Amino acid sequence: MTTPGTFEIHATDGAARTGCLHTAHGIVRTPIFMPVGTVGSVKAIAPDDLEAIGAEIILGNTYHLYLRPGDELVARRGGLHEFNAWRKPILTDSGGFQVFSLSGLRRIAEEGVEFRSHLDGSKHLFTPEKVVSIQRNLNSDIMMVLDECVPYGADRTYTEKSVGLTTRWAKRCRDAYPKGAAGNLLFGITQGGFFKDLRTRSIGALTDIDFDGFALGGLSVGEPKAEMMDLLYHSAPLLPADKPRYLMGVGTPLDIINGIAAGVDMFDCVLPTRNARNGTLYTSLGKLNIKRREFAEDDGPLDPACSCYTCRTFSRAYLRHLYTAKELLAFRLNSIHNLTYFLDLVRGARAAIAAGRFAEYKRSFEAIYPEEVVA
């Protein structure tokens, strides 16, 4: 078996690249989209559904799993793979973003971040060492360091101070889990807000720490699309070329295409499943709102170009009926389709890069989502 953490690049087309990342639970082909299973399950989707649509890796969240059911409970059951019956790779976020976004009361210090649970108000402390320990209990294939995700609009003084703290926390995470200690991989998270020089500084500082991969954090936090794209194309090429690059929490189909064009390998976002539960579905012709009356007697498939179970089996009329009747099956069928769309997107990107036609592939998505194109 190839050593976990081995990252091979198979083809390039401009900055876009295809490859594979070896983990303790199998190979992840890149570029890849990771369905989000925040509390250990991808909402409305069973593991066999994920297998059927070709998911290769899913994401879990340290903050949520620590609070409920508890990482030690999961560890006693053999780790998250045994607990949720997903046998392929799992990445766990450190929970830092949730601490800063969900916890109304929190205190940041050199030691870590103190916060109150959004469930019952109980007080907790996340240190770099603690989040590594939690993720070791979960036994995820890829663990993330504790970082501070500064909000959009934070001034330079605060952001510069935060970059220093995030760097020191990252070093403590690496010290708590030395490289090669076990089969779990540890990724660093670069920050820097919306200041290019601070982004460059953060990347340089974390590159000096020997992580198995590197993430771009703190994007898609409310900034204008043009600003996000500017920072993405500035930052991604600065990340080590021989390690996997991960754009956290992004995004729309065209965001992912732009990320791939910038040289990013890994993506996650709640958008496909959240929108599925709200009746917004992605198709080869763009977004479709299944709630619309025009679909009440439409016997055609949701997307004739899609081969997922939903599109092979059910009509738009039936899908609209399920949604308007508030049937739970609507969540599953819509989620199967949207996740298939996102996974087909990265599968298509891999093929386009290998064939040397990624620019053409990118233009095809710009034609589908013209409102998102940044000049």
UniProtKB/Swiss-Prot annotation:
Cofactor requirement: Zn(2+)
Pathway annotation: tRNA modification; tRNA-queuosine biosynthesis
Biological processes, Gene Ontology terms: queuosine biosynthetic process; tRNA wobble guanine modification; tRNA-guanine transglycosylation
The record's free-text note on cofactor binding: Binds 1 zinc ion per subunit.
Active site, renumbered: D93, D268
Annotated binding of Zn(2+), by residue: C306, C308, C311, H337
GO molecular function: metal ion binding; tRNA-guanosine(34) queuine transglycosylase activity
Residue numbers spanned by region RNA binding: 249-255, 273-277
One GO CC term, this protein: cytosol
Function: Catalyzes the base-exchange of a guanine (G) residue with the queuine precursor 7-aminomethyl-7-deazaguanine (PreQ1) at position 34 (anticodon wobble position) in tRNAs with GU(N) anticodons (tRNA-Asp, -Asn, -His and -Tyr). Catalysis occurs through a double-displacement mechanism. The nucleophile active site attacks the C1' of nucleotide 34 to detach the guanine base from the RNA, forming a covalent enzyme-RNA intermediate. The proton acceptor active site deprotonates the incoming PreQ1, allowing a nucleophilic attack on the C1' of the ribose to form the product.
Record protein name field: Queuine tRNA-ribosyltransferase
Organism (species): Nitratidesulfovibrio vulgaris (strain ATCC 29579 / DSM 644 / CCUG 34227 / NCIMB 8303 / VKM B-1760 / Hildenborough)
